[in-house]
A protein has these predicted regions:
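Terminal intrinsically disordered, low-complexity extensions flanking WD-repeat/beta-propeller proteins
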Residues: 76, 81-87, 92-97, 101-202
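Loop/turn segments within WD40 beta-propeller blades
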Residues: 2-8, 46-52, 90-96, 144-149
Length: 202
């Protein structure tokens, strides 16, 4: 479950393989806006802190996809195929990146005793920035981010807690102040007030 940075929406995932997006502008009368289907239970949900209508979701072992949604329209913008069960997703507040933690994963191609525990992606190009490999016996159960937004805290299946310094929190993005390409659609970008520089057609 997560709430958008403008506090107008809440998204809830469950074992029914569905994410439900509610308009909570009026807390006394929440309105169901969209149901987003997945192929497995959805545990990982995160609204983008610098673009309130950008939602990312991650599902279990039978799905293994990170999906990006435009919550004003319910549009699936993009997705990333991963190597395992997605247990958490966290956006950076200092750069356009996203970190995913993994539970049950496919063993690493170079070492069958290792698998991906944590992976950082850039957005919107979805490039892998960093990946942390661990023993296949280790699974990330859940994660959180430090109060200064630079360290990821993982709860591990071996009853340990691990801290990874991922980002330098030197500055924070402000909502909506970005170039085009965030949503992968010129129409959605225009609706969000995001404009690319281009020559006027006369």
């Amino acid at each position: 479950m997560d709430v958008s940075s403008d506090t107008r929406e809440i998204s809830v995932g469950g074992n029914d393989n569905i994410v439900k997006i509610y308009d909570i502008s009026n807390l006394e009368s929440p309105i169901l806006k969209f149901t987003l289907k997945h192929q497995a239970a959805v545990k990982a949900i995160a609204y983008c802190p610098w673009m309130p209508s950008l939602l990312v979701t991650g599902a279990g072992s039978k799905d293994r996809k990170i999906r990006f949604w435009h919550t004003k329209t319910g549009t699936l913008i993009d997705s990333i195929e991963t190597e395992g069960q997605i247990t958490s997703l966290i956006w950076s507040k200092s750069c356009k990146q996203l970190v995913a933690s993994f539970g049950f994963s496919t063993p690493d191609v170079h070492d069958n005793d290792k698998s991906v525990l944590l992976q950082v992606y850039s957005y919107p190009d979805k490039r892998t920035v960093t990946r942390i490999i661990a023993s296949t016996s280790m699974r990330a159960l859940s994660s959180s981010i430090s109060s200064n937004y630079d360290t990821i805290v993982l709860a591990i299946s071996d009853q340990s807690v691990r801290l990874y310094n991922i980002w330098k929190a030197s500055h924070n993005f402000s909502c909506g102040s970005f170039e085009g390409g965030i949503f992968g659609s010129n129409i959605i970008d225009l609706d969000e007030g995001i404009h690319d520089s281009f020559e006027v057609i006369r």
